[in-house]
Structure formats: structure tokens, C-alpha cells
């Protein structure tokens, strides 16, 4: 451990500057205007993998943005760890809410503020620097492969094809991902599962054009009003989702599982204070931990229609739109939930409007085994680095590739994230603690060490 700490201390300035350089690339995969920047980011990542000691580094072309592959095979008889991450980021909007430019990393109070600081540039780059550390100190105990994609934030639409076409190249014993969070740096945790996702857009159309609200208001259905009513009807008075069949396949936690989940440290007042809300909201009968990790949800991600510019324009809009995401739990299937939503949405629509539902992307929920060699290696690594055992938690987010790895490669994933829920992922002023960045670089080599040792027992 001291060797690791010494190397990080000696090179921490350069390691931070390299991360800053990565964060300056506006690699927004959702917006075509950033295409050149996304491609430049891919080349930068490939260059840094080569500099760190990776071999057979390749910028692999896809129908979308490239996937970066690299490896270091020290001994074919040794176990292999496949590291996954993504170099694309969410759009920075709304820009006016950022205190500093989103693609000019700024340090305040020991935290790096930039889009992608935590999700996922800061976290995947820890693995690149941890790999460099092991190479430079001659302590790499197992084989390592990297697969860093550029389309995670838009559903990883080309990753499945790449994995299917490269099964031999991607052959490994475990996948290691840092794209999740810890409870806190005082209470380290390991995520034992992720929710799935169904993401779609709905369109409600009324008249064939925007109308004068004085001339036609009261006689013609307003699509914005209809859409708002339809969305509101999808939760009952207990905040239970009302789509028929939505909960049919949900596996309820046992009382023992619920008790274990809710034993994690949690300060509700601090939680509310951080979010600046007076009261929490959610499905009745479940705790915050359960609602955000083990229960399915339906959320409106965006809603618009009519005139939203400066000043006033008295129109009755022709159309209204919403983007909706549903987080899923084990046994629910993304495509099935999308179909249930679509059927219900069309059924509850009045005859005065027309409905269109467009699926975007989805992913399946996963649960990772806590009795595996890889999970035990992560436990030991975190305990040595932090001085205490990690608390098992269930993550509320979705990483569709995890289920894909299991289905196509037959391997499980370890979710060893170093972010915090308060890091404002997908929001203005995203941040990542510098302490967490260095702590990750120190902890990751320990995972490889213990994974290699436990694999030989």
C-alpha cells in the first residue's frame, strides 16, 4: 500500500492535469454539433492508454462513435479483468446555471467542477492511472483489458454489436466498472445491483396548427393540458404507478433484505437540505433507500409545447411533448414495460387528440453476486484503502452494458464507484472530489492484487 501511496503522491499533479485535459473536450454524444470533439476525445483516450503501457490499442469504428480498446496480457494463465468506462458526457444545458464554464475544469473547495468530472471521465480515468501505476511499479498481477465507449449517454446503441463481434478479444473473468457512487467517503459502499431503464418520448397532437387561444380556447382540446393530465394520472394517491401490469414481475424484497438495506447510514434532514426541499416524495410504504434502488419508478425528464419564448403569445398549441424514463428492477423487462406504457398511454388518451410514442433506448436491471471472488476482492481492496468494510447498496441508475456483458460474455460485473450522489450528475455544476480521484487510483491496484490472489486459491 505504501508503494501505491508514494507513486500517487509523486505524480498526483500530472495525473490531475491529464484529467483536466480530458475534461476540456466537450464530448457530448447526444448533440451532433459536438461530433468533432467527441472524435478528438476518443483519440486522446487511446493516446493516454498507450502512454500508460497498454498494447494493441485501437480506436474501433462503429456506426456511431468509436470504442477504445487496449490490453496488457502478462500471462495467459492469469485471470483477466475487463475495465469498462465511457468518455462521452451529458449535454451541459442549462448553461446559465453553471457557476463556471462546464468544459473548463475549475477547482473549488477541493472539488473539480466540470461536465463529466464524475460521470464518467474522472472515474474511468482513475483506472488508466492505476494501470500506469502498476506498470511503472512492476506490480500488475493479472491481465487487463480496457473498453471505453463514446455512446453510453445515448443508450450504447452500437456497443452490443461490438461485443458480439469481439467475444474472443473481450474474453475476461470479470468486468470492473467505476460509474457509480459511494454512500460517502466516510462510509464506503459497493453497489450490488442496478436498475434497468425504459426511455421514450411521447407526442400529443390536437389541431393542425397553433390556434388563437381567445378564438378557439374552450372549444378545442389543448394538447399541453391533455398531456399534463395523462402524465399526472400515472401515479395514484400513494405515488404508485397506475400502468396495468407494471408491477406484475417485480420481485419484492424479503423483510431481512429490507432491514439490511435500511441499516446503511442515512440522515434524512441532510438529504433534504442538500436538495433544498422541504419534504420527500415517493411510493408510500418504502424508505428512501428502497425507493431509489429497489423500486421501479416513472419520471418526466422534460415536457414542452406551445410558446416558451420571452414575453406573451396567447396560443393554443398544436402539439405537446414529453420525455419519460422508467427505472426498472429485477425481473422487469425493458421492452415489455415500454409496450405496457404505450398501450396504456394510447388507451387513456381522449378522442380529441392523437398520440405517438417513440421508444429511445433501454436496458435490463442487474444484481451482482456478493459471494464471487471479484466482489470479495473489491471488499478487501476497499477495506484496506478506507480502513472499514464497504456497505452493500443497490444503485438507482442504469448501465445497460452490465446485462449485455453477462448475456454475451458470460461474466459478472463489479461496480466499484467512487462518486457521490451529491456530485450533480447530469446537472449543472457537476463535480468530483479530488480526494476521491486519488483514492480511486490507490484502491484499484488493490482490487487487481486481491482478485489475482483469490483466483489462485
Regions found by a protein language model. Give the residues of each.
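Flexible glycine/proline-rich, aromatic-decorated loop/lid segments
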Residues: 189-205, 414
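An extended, acidic, His-containing surface patch that forms the Zn2+-binding/catalytic region
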Residues: 51, 184-185, 242-319, 330-343, ...
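Active-site metal-coordination/substrate-binding segment of hydrolases
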Residues: 78-145, 439
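Acidic/histidine-rich catalytic neighborhood of metal-dependent amide-processing enzymes
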Residues: 118-193, 455-457
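A short core secondary-structure module
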Residues: 217-239
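N-terminal helical capping/dimerization or prosegment-like subdomains
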Residues: 1-95, 319, 336
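Acidic, glycine-rich active-site loops and adjacent beta-strand->loop/helix elements
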Residues: 87-89, 147-155, 178-182, 206-208, ...
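A generic structural motif
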Residues: 118, 208, 326-333, 363
